[in-house]
């Protein structure tokens, strides 16, 4: 429930602090005093649109905050907990608007996006505006009212989810089909491009090995000649060779070491060098023996190497990248080849998803039909109480499978007959302004009782109503206030007198500036205000007596 409202520098309000209570609170005031200004300010806390013109003239910013008790609001508490914003049993929404139109939103002191403020606001307060009777003529509003009364949140969520899944898959299938012809042309091009690569069948690391072999074969003569020269220098030279010389050095060092111990380490060092030279000699000898210049092999390697280089140039890649390029083209072809198979599988999936949507929409439809009959009776009864004794009301729910939406297949129409003998027709065709106001109020009061929102606001919803009908409206709202908090802006004394509490809005001018104030009235002040509403500026004993009767009758 709304416990406190703080308004600073909003429109013509300098500063306003309101403590609010359970039950029904009525708000009255003179014409032009700004009876709805507190509701407008509260709307900012609930995520309403912000404008620079809302900032009081001469001030830098507007700041509005609303404190709510969460004792009986499990949905709001759960939402706050899920979003890591829960702080005890109270929730404070705050909004700041600067004179240049910038806006900041806060929940329990933490900055939040406006979307979160709106979402939480819907769990805290339900606002019924003075133009609701105009909305009542719109089919989408009529459908919303029925769903709200029936508590279709879960069914609507399931239907919307099924619809979105079906439409997403349908759009994917449509895109695949549109691309099919283009894919065929692309497939033919890829198959032409890949033909030579398939014939080449290059291995993953083959080019590196091929390049090394080609270089080796191309230089085989020089390799053999230089190998032979190195072998001769190492060990096979007739006049001199490295191993022979090093062996002579080794013998000499051994003799020297025997003569002087300081040279003991030198023979072993030369011995190690001898071992390495001998190993080098044997490696070269084996390598020379392996050199076998095969003209056929050389021709094969040259031809294959040339093909790799040619295809690499043709495909605009480096030779060492040709294998990966080939694999990428194969993958593209595989993807295009399976497009028909993919389309077939996706078409089957679309059918399944559509049937899921149809099942969810049908379940929602049946529930709407059931609750429409229930709501028919309640609204007709309420209209009779609101001085429309002969009126008949009916909600028509028609299912049209050709027109699907996230809300299912249903079209809802509110039908009414205001006089005996008249057929039921859409309310926009037959109802007058006053009748629309009464029907709208009846629907709002009935649906409000079904919504799990602890605070309800009725902003001049009694427009077009007077006399005994106004008294009935007041009693309906008071009864509603016994189970939930109701704030009602009204100009009717019969409605104002039914409130458990009453606030008075006054406008005054100070130092050339207009200010709006809101006062909580005691019993005597309420009688005086009700008398003013009954008789205008001239308050008489008769109007005072009537005002007292209104309070007693409530």
Swiss-Prot record:
ATP binds at residues 29-36. Belongs to the RecN family. GO terms for biological process: DNA recombination; double-strand break repair; SOS response. It comes from Vibrio cholerae serotype O1 (strain ATCC 39315 / El Tor Inaba N16961). It comes from the Bacteria. GO terms for cellular component: bacterial nucleoid. SUPFAM superfamilies: P-loop containing nucleoside triphosphate hydrolases. One of its GO terms (molecular function) is ATP binding. The keyword RNA-binding does not apply. This is DNA repair protein RecN. InterPro entries: DNA_recomb/repair_RecN, P-loop_NTPase, Rad50/SbcC_AAA. The keyword Nucleotide-binding applies. May be involved in recombinational repair of damaged DNA. It holds the Pfam family AAA_23. Keywords: ATP-binding, DNA damage, DNA repair, Nucleotide-binding.
